[in-house]
């Protein structure tokens, strides 16, 4: 399994607008591509967000990056041409430990 993580560092004045966009439009549309099993959206501070996209295979991630990412990135840049910094990373899951119930 792969995690494709996108981190946004946003100017504080844009934070709520970016969060609304991500939760209300961007992430649901990406999920609808069928390339990811699960998507998780997190906030580290009022203006720092991380989205983790869980892909079952490299082929699924490649399909997203080739067939869908250019469109989504262009739309995002159109709506937010400035005021934020984006970083992207791909993580390969090595091992998962089960959580025990208390």
Question: Which residues make up each language-model segment?
Answer:
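Active-site-flanking beta-strand signature of metal-NTP-handling nucleotidyl enzymes
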Residues: 2-8, 50
